[in-house]
Amino acid sequence: MPVSLAVCETTANVVNAALRESLGSCVARAALSADEAKTSNGGGDGSSTSGSSTDNLQSQIVANAKRVLLAKIDYEEVDNYHESVLAKLKSKYIVIKPDSNGGAASNGNGNYNGSNKTNGKFGAGNGHDNNGNGNGIVNGGTSALNGGNNRKQIVVVDHQSSNQHGSPSNPNELPKPKRVLYQREHIRIGWKQSERKWQVGTGMLNVGNTCYLNSSLQALFHIPSLANWLVSESAHLENCNISESCGSNGCIICAMAKTLQSTQSNQSAVRPFLIYSKLRQICKHMVVGRQEDAHEFLRFLIEAMEKAYLMRFRNYKELDQLVKETTPLNQIFGGYLRSEVRCLSCNHVSITFQHFQDLLLDIRKSDTLEDAFDGYFSRERLEDMGYKCEGCKKKVSATKQFSLERAPITLCIQLKRFSMMGNKLTKQISFKPRIDLSRFAARSPTAAAQPLSYRLVSMVTHLGVSQHCGHYTAIGLTETGSYYNFDDSCVRPIAMQSVCNTNAYIMFYELDVNGNGHVVAPKMNGMRLTTNGGQQHSSPVVATAPAAVVSATATSTSASVSAAAVTSPRFIGPQLPNGYGNSNGHALGGGAAKTAIQFKTTPQKHQQQQQAQTQYQLNGHINGAAKFQTGAANANANKSSCNTLNNSKQHQPQQQQQQPQHILPISSDEEEDSDDDNDNDNVKTNKAPQLPSMPKMFEESSESVALTAKLKPKTALKSLVPYESASEEEEQQQQQQQQTLQQQAATNSRKRRSGADSSDTDDDDDEEQQQQQQQQPSLILRNGHAKTNGNLLNSSSSKTKSASNASSANVNSSKQKTDAIDEIFKSLNNYKNKHRNDHNHVDDDDDDDEDEDEDEDEAQAQAEKKTVTKSSSSSSSTSLTNGWQQSQNGKATASPKTPPSPAVIKTKTGIWQVTRNDEDDDENVDGVADADDDDDNDEVAEPAVVTAKNHKNPFAAGKATATTDANPSAKRQKLLNGSSKSQQTTPRIGNGYQGESLPNGNAVVSELLKQNHRGYGSSVLSWNGKASELDKETFDLVCAKRIAGYGAAAADEHCCDVNSGHSSNYGTNYKSLNNDMSSSSSSSSSTNSSSNSSSRSNGNSSNCPPCDLLAEAREQRKRDDDDEEENEMDRGRQRKIKSASVKCGSGATAAPPGYNPFQEYESQKRWHSNKSGSYSRFYHHPNYRSNFQQRNKFKHNRFAGGGGGAKFQQQRALQRHLASGGGFTRRQHHQSSGQQQQQS
């Protein structure tokens, strides 16, 4: 036998027989021939070194034979032993002395000793070529072949290697690997290919900044091809033998498979500990507990899984790169890009191939995913003279363009949202659940006729503004066709509209082709790789597996004919396009006719016929059962006869779409088509049953707001004002009050102007009601009162008219001023007599609630409240104020002609007179008010019980300054717009100072404080000629109430309840608190002020008439002097007064059970200045900050700094106090009283 090592079987007996044969004479002769060839190549004499070389070669063969015998032989079950074992073994061995007709073989078998030199020379000459060919095979090079038999053997032995490095067959074709580790046909695409039932999957617990890990795993587990492969690794899972090198829990593939099974079997969230514990194994620089990038983790995770799979093979380190790219992970995610660089000088085209597992798309100049693909695969120009052309042999300008040589089964897309500096591009990129990449594939026209369709199966989203902070979530497609959002342990369904509007970061698209059995390599993926043989053998390969491979650039005519024969029946006639026209996807290798019959099932065809027209009109997609499928009509400009199928289905009756039993299981696909394409077709108004996880309520309501708003009284804007819905009865009362007041004021000479305003308002109501129906239809029928809600948008116009009315009203004579005051008291007296037994308490509660909600509901509440009371406001304000409409209709305008309207009240405690100390003091005519004082009081003293809706009683002992408005400018604007309902029709409109100007509603006390601090400490009030301490008493009362446990919101509520007289408990408690505080404040409250406080509380509980008259008089006073600039200045000072009062009052109380920020400031000041040891520290709780100095030594030393630090803190506190309007004497008093209470 001339061959030393022939094709060997893998059994031990065959190896031993080959070893014995190699040690015989045949081995010696063959070895001698090889040795002579080597000596001839080296230029030496063959006879001199033949003996030693033969011994050396024989010793090497014996050593290698022993190694083969001692090696462990693994057995593996294969389908075809001849093709999978013997054919592969041929590529491992080199023929030392092949058969040839040149006489070398016969001479080699002949006289060994006699013709050594001659045979050696001839053999050496022929051996040079053979050695050259052999070395070319081993090293990857190519050389000229001399003999036809030599060519045949070389091609059989290593045709793959010669193809890999540019064989003469076709250098522009993708090279073939020597060995395929995992066949592409074994990948099962789609959930339907698995035998098991796939659940939605549970969430994953976040164990500390692991949202990137959880979202990445969820996205991978919802890729059907990857999930099916992980489940199929059960045999490896049981017999994993690489746990020693990959950790105690097994390899990373086993950890992934176990984690996937746990998410499918458990009902609650799982902890991905098997993956989290191998984080350093996946990537060395990743740290447990630190935030990482999801895409980076994905890349390292897939690479670790590939390495774990390669470790199953003994010689995995010796495998070349092409073989390593045939792992299951590369078969799923891997693809090849074709790069064509064209020289602009000689038009030479250089073609290279690049392996990829994901596409990184630049979105800076794109708004849609299709635009990003166009930019990625577009032709770009390289920099001038920067490319060295192989044809020109010089640097020239060139263009470069990518195309898909082999499309992956699962396409991973990463949008470049992060820069090198960590900044994030947060622009919205719109995408569709199905994409077609046929126009980017480098394929023949025959293969290009079939669309390269992908379906969105999962995605990873990032919430945040930077790469270094944020949160990752995942979205996955389940077997039912619904999408679910996976936010760590939270799993919830998500509509297709929300999916497409998500700022995606990583997206996974899978080929939209499924099969019943083992999925073969799809024809639509544009690949040219065949797993059996090269391009020369494409014809036999297609014969054995016709649906597995279609060579797009087949070199033989038979291959092209076979490919056309397989694919042509799919596009002829109106039959369903098998493999992609329905849910079955890939075709099996059994022939075209058999495949076509196999996929013609009646239920699927019926479902497609009833949806074909709608889906084709939307985006040309053809639905399968709960799966995305793509029609061939929109594949590319290369039209095929598949359009006949779509056109024929387009003319199907539309009534088939309304069959609920067929539409229900695939409603999610209909929504995906309709929502993604944004078409206004039949699907938008389809009344077919929808899946509960994917509603279309938002889109439908947004398109038909004008229709649904008239039928639904409850709208989203109405919910922003929760107390407005219970005001129908109040609106009716206000309308009645408006009519009554107009009749009572009919004799007034100035009513003509108010009537004109009312008519103008009605006209505006009609116009603005029509405007409202067009612009804001959700408020047309808010409470069923179209008239009261018609003035939603006329705030600016109302301000303008009110300003003009006020300015015209201010040009009256002094006689008209006196008549205006008389008219005020008469109208209020008649109003109280008429509405004494009406529903007063409901309005008070509603007004209190509205005052509390003014800041957060400003925009909607202002518009709605103003709408409710605009009509009544214009007329009632004119009748009440005899033409002064400043507080009613808008902002108060300043005018020197404004009448003073003083309030002189005779009560049980004496005659009270309130004067002014502001810029308008010179213009107030107090004498006129004094002249009318007794008459007015006699008229209004009769009703003894009373206030109709006066919950802002001026004498209510409420907290006037404790609650600081969070947004004073918003409150002011709301006040000027006249948006409060009861404010404009109730007798609170006295002398101009509205109780609603402050949150607590204590109008008189707040006004007294404001006037008192105009001079920063000068008293301007007189109580029977005596200086009043009301401002200081109010500070104590307010602070006492807060310290007693009432919160800010509760204090407002209690104050309103006490003022209105509806809660006897609150009134009693507050009165007792008032009395206690009056008695405890030695320096700030006198006996007279204490009795006055008690009498005011009692008067409030009994609703005395003088209190009401005083409130009315002060409301009228406010209308006279409130202009915009003055009001703004007053509010700024008022806010300072509030801060000072709270600070002063907080130190003069006992240990508070609640929290007070100003008390915290005072306590912190005492903590910092405690080194002097003057007094013991005070804490809110016995164990609260007991070791503050020991635990915060740095802060203590930094801010306290011994005596100097305490002095500095005291000085700063004093400066803040004085700047806020407080007095020095008052501060010392409260600080000393606070120290006494703390020491006690």
Swiss-Prot record:
GO terms for biological process: germ-line stem cell population maintenance; negative regulation of macroautophagy; protein deubiquitination; proteolysis; regulation of apoptotic process; somatic stem cell population maintenance. Residues 639-649, 880-890, 976-988 have a biased composition (Polar residues). It is found in: Nucleus, Nucleolus. GO terms for molecular function: cysteine-type deubiquitinase activity. The modification Phosphothreonine is found at T715, T898. Belongs to the peptidase C19 family. The keyword NADP does not apply. The gene is Usp36. This is Ubiquitin carboxyl-terminal hydrolase 36. Gene3D superfamilies: Cysteine proteinases (3.90.70.10).
